[in-house]
Amino acid sequence: VLLAAGNGVAQQNYSKSEGLLQYVDPYIGSGYHGHIFVGTSVPYGMVQLGPTNIHKGWDWCSGYHYSDSILIGFSHTHLSGTGCTDLCDILIMPLNEIRTPRGNQDDIRDGYASRYSHANEIRPEYYSLLLDRYNIKAELTATDRVGFHRYTYPEGKPASILIDLREGNGSNAYDSYIRKVDDYTVEGYRYVRGWSPSRKVYFVLKSDKKIEQFTAYDDNTPQPWDQLKVASVKSVLTFGNVKEVKIKVALSSVSCDNAAMNLQSELTHWDFDKVVDMSADRWNKQLEKMTVETDDEASKRVFY
């Protein structure tokens, strides 16, 4: 089954992975009708943080398809291998130009979407991608309930991120909310009816850089308040002329307060590489529960 779902892409550089994790190829199943999520997570984690394409039908059930080359951001929940379309909640897109329309597959120039190539690095504990349009390097990792982002911006333009609470995979929010809590914290939620009749996803976002400007949008119309509750909430956070921004996004299905507690219990520091190493250790321990003895490297990659 794994061979049938695989897309035959070349192996990436897994030199940083050790143990059985070095044999994992996250691209297997991301083409054809595989419906496999591509991104980063920990075993059985609530967060599956990874790239999201514009939804174009059944082959995009996970929010991503290997044939695609247009990215609308990084969302924190993805289905994998289900054949059903849903999730892709709490979409984050790093920007150095303020844009709030999404854009479309045929012409992205009027929106925030960006082209990308597959010359990136992906392992279960780490995902990295260069946004061609903005020349921004994105790096992602995760704990159980927290997505950890590290963005490196080119010089000369203010560093920003877009939060799109309307956008989902095949289903848009019917209610959403965002609030600036302080100069480093934003919270909100997204209510959606999709394949699941009703889902509620709450989040708290913290940045390591001061939010110099917070703008909430009703779809693409800016609003003058530090909080907003409408069906199509978007927000742009601007950090000024900084080289690097780290953000942590904690999730809860209960409340924003619970999301804040999840963040406090799982990730109080800002050491991105430490979280990558922690995730790698957890994956290796999980993979070590079953081993295969063979000298065939390709068979190991298919198995793991």
Ranges and model annotations:
Residues 1-12:
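Bacterial Sec-dependent N-terminal signal peptides
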Residues 12-304:
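Accessory carbohydrate-recognition regions in carbohydrate-active enzymes
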